[in-house]
């Protein structure tokens, strides 16, 4: 079973994993009703409402925390939860705290769990973002500074890690990141896109211990992995 299959990593994994059952907003109620009476080898929980500015807190709670609890009540052999390296940020946010609370729910309700904290995700089913606009040369202006730094990992590499982790029955928390961050200027130069940059410098949490670092460096990622 895979959640969040409407777009992003969830959709990519659902399309890549043979015979998997996918959950999105359109079939959520039906699938969850049927799932309680079945048993699953693996549940991969990718769905999350990433809002940083929340207006309806009860809905935010239901979509992110209650849904995680309900998934854990479905009979299963292994549970993989997609988290984020934003939990390492010094500044506090509802996004950070909700991810940490969801992780705690998983840890306390499932012995055979895998929590994977990833950096920024790139793949064919991702929603439009600054990276995609640079790649498509459609970004003309952004509030981000050219010195903003991001850390990217590819859907296909995360999927492969999930498969291998399940086969080897890995348990615990893993940080899945690239070895180096990449500046927005580097990405812009690589794709030959020259937008008007702003002043806001975004930085990615990077000094993370016990990380599975996927690529040699930023240049290797752009030239060899991103094709």
Language model features with spans:
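C-terminal substrate-binding subdomain of Rossmann-fold SDR/epimerase-dehydratase oxidoreductases
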Residues: 144-146, 153-227
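NAD(P)-dependent short-chain dehydrogenase/reductase
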Residues: 100, 104-151, 155
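A short beta-strand-loop structural module common to alpha/beta enzyme folds
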Residues: 19-29
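Catalytic helix-loop patch of NAD(P)-dependent Rossmann-fold dehydrogenases
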Residues: 59-67, 84-116, 120-121
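N-terminal Rossmann NAD(P)H-binding glycine-rich loop of SDR-like oxidoreductase domains
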Residues: 1-19
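Conserved cofactor-binding/catalytic machinery of classical short-chain dehydrogenase/reductase
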Residues: 66-67, 78, 101-102, 154-157
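NAD(P)H-binding glycine-rich loop region in Rossmannoid oxidoreductase-like domains
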Residues: 31-66, 70-74, 84-89
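SDR active-site strand-loop-helix element
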Residues: 3, 43-46, 79-85, 116-118
